[in-house]
Each structure stands twice: as structure tokens, then as C-alpha cells.
Amino acid sequence: ELAVDDDYIRKNPSKGVYRSLKSEGSGKPAKTRIALTKEQQKNYLRFISKSPMYSHWLPVMVVLLGTGLRVGECTGLTKNDVDLENNTISVNHNLIYRVIDGKADFHITTPKTASGTRTIPILYPEVAEQLRALIEVMDALYPEDLVMNGYHGFIFRNRSGYFLSAHNIN
């Protein structure tokens, strides 16, 4: 722009380039994601189940692998979202831990797009078994309900009975 202002050139050839690049994305090719094979998933879950250090993560890993839920969707699951009779999970919110209005805390957010709100099938009996067992254990261990923005009956909790953070899983 300085060269245009000083009459060295009549038109800035780079004007609007940044806007164009920004609208096209970062210009970097998208990372190729490679899904775990069934065998890799079995090995992963076997490792977790036998590990004294990681075995407490087995229920959340079974649900994540068996449903394809995002971590915030999984940690935000409530008993009302899970229908074990019809083997479905209703996805309509996420549990996040962020700084909002200057305060770091857990918050409920809704999916960014309409397609983010969905009902997914529970295709594997292991997922239903883990969810059923978790609900029973959480009810027994933590009879006091956590409530966040009207949502209650959270299935996944940390060892203290509070919300399970996605940061711990990631």
C-alpha cells in the first residue's frame, strides 16, 4: 500500500490475497487420518484392561472406540442421553473445560452444526455393558447428582466424583 500511496505502482498486486488465502483455509494439505484396525483396537483395549496404571480408563475407551463419539460428547453423556433398551445414544451437547468470562470451569455447549446433533446406534454389546455398569457404579459411588446448565446424571466422572475433563483423556 505504501508503494501505491507514493505513486511507485498504480495497483497493489497483493491486495486481497490474505483474505483469499484465509477463505481457502491454511493452504496446508489436510492431514490424513488413519483409523485403527479391528485388531489394533482389540490390542489397545487388551493393553488398557491389563494395565494397573490405565485400567480405570477402559470404560471411556470402549465407549469412544465403539461409538465414534468425540471426547467432549462422551464426557458430557448423561443417563438421559443413553437408551439401553433401544441401543441408542442421543448426542446434543458437549462438556468442555474453558475460560469463559474470565473464569476457567466446565461448561455445556451445543454442537457447532445441525449435523452434530444426532442419534447414534450402540452397535457393540461391550459398549452397552460398559455404559450399564458405569451407570450402576456411579449411582452407588456418587449418589449426589452433578448439575450443569440443566443437565444431570453425568455418566463419566473423575475419581473425586466431579466432571471428567477431556484434557485427561486426550
Enumerate the predicted regions with their spans:
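Non-catalytic DNA-binding core/recognition domains of DNA-processing enzymes
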Residues: E1-A3, V17, I122
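Compact Cys/His-rich, Zn2+-coordinating modules
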Residues: L95-D105
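Arg/Lys-rich amphipathic alpha helix in sigma70-family domain 2
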Residues: V4-R10, A133-E136
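Short, basic (Lys/Arg/His-rich) helix/loop patches that form interaction surfaces
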Residues: R46-W57, T67, I120, V137-L146, ...
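C-terminal catalytic core of Y-nucleophile DNA break-rejoin enzymes
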Residues: A30, T88-S90, V99-I100, T109-A133, ...
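Short, Lys/Arg-enriched alpha-helical recognition elements, typified by the DNA-recognition helix
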Residues: E1-V4, P13, G153-I155
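Basic, Lys/Arg- and aromatic-enriched nucleic-acid-binding interface segment
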Residues: I9, K15-V71, T75-L77, E85, ...
